[in-house]
Swiss-Prot record:
Gene from which the chain derives: rpsE
A GO molecular function held by the record: structural constituent of ribosome
Record's comment describing the protein's domains: The N-terminal domain interacts with the head of the 30S subunit; the C-terminal domain interacts with the body and contacts protein S4. The interaction surface between S4 and S5 is involved in control of translational fidelity.
Any Gene Ontology CC annotation: small ribosomal subunit
Organism for this UniProt entry: Syntrophobacter fumaroxidans (strain DSM 10017 / MPOB)
Role summary: With S4 and S12 plays an important role in translational accuracy. Located at the back of the 30S subunit body where it stabilizes the conformation of the head with respect to the body.
Chain segments annotated as transmembrane: none
Domain S5 DRBM: 11-74
InterPro entries cross-referenced by the UniProt entry: Ribosomal_Su5_D2-typ_SF, Ribosomal_uS5, Ribosomal_uS5_bac-type, Ribosomal_uS5_C, Ribosomal_uS5_N, Ribosomal_uS5_N_CS, Ribsml_uS5_D2-typ_fold_subgr
Protein name, as recorded: Small ribosomal subunit protein uS5
Subunit-structure text: Part of the 30S ribosomal subunit. Contacts proteins S4 and S8.
Biological processes annotated in GO: translation
Family: Belongs to the universal ribosomal protein uS5 family.
Amino acid sequence: MIALESSQLQLIDKVVHISRVAKVVKGGRRFSFSAIVVVGDGNGRVGFSLGKANEVPEAIRKGMESAKRTMFEVPLVNATIPHEVLGRFGAASVVLKPASAGTGVIAGGAVRAIMEAAGIHNILTKCIGSRNPHNVVKATLEGLRRLRNVELVAKLRGREVHEIRD
């Protein structure tokens, strides 16, 4: 894999969710913030992270820096995914289905942010079970990691690409 300078890339960053969390101490409550951040290049690479800090902007910045390090490649075919896939994490399940050109991104909240950051323009999605943003993001990314393109499937099966497509 080629290491790319993050300053060379035009990255799309989306804040999925911000939480205020409290630590109870002897003198009362200490508040801090956590931010779920998704980062992508809009061309098939996406990553996510959770940033935590005492201030919201700092939590977002930390999340962005960490998300850049977790980016991975998503196989795309004409701005959609190559096949249907189910991603699961905890009680959250996310169904991802390829869609024809012109359909758009049919997705809600957390899933939409990931699709836009990854550069997927036509897709149908459905969240099943838990709608918790943490688990939905992780389930969606797990589904995207399970995607395989035709060339890889052909190689794994020891066949030619045209045999797989037919």
